[in-house]
Amino acid sequence: AVHVIHSGESGIFIPKVEHNMWVQKGTLIGEIVTPITGTVEEEITAPSDGLIFSLREYPIVYEGSVIARILSMS
């Protein structure tokens, strides 16, 4: 199955993983921060074990933006 991860907040996306990386459920994928203060608005975690095969490169995100896609083997 493919899990598409969306942003729940608007701001700047700072990735904490790399493309083509294996992650476990709960792994921190990245953070959404406010551009002026740098306050973390959202921590985005992996919903399942799997392979990150798509990871956002453009840092500006809006609520609902696609952040990553994970290929899960379960």
Residue ranges and their predicted role:
Residues 68-74:
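C-terminal regulatory/interaction regions
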Residues 1-31, 35-67:
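Generic structural motif
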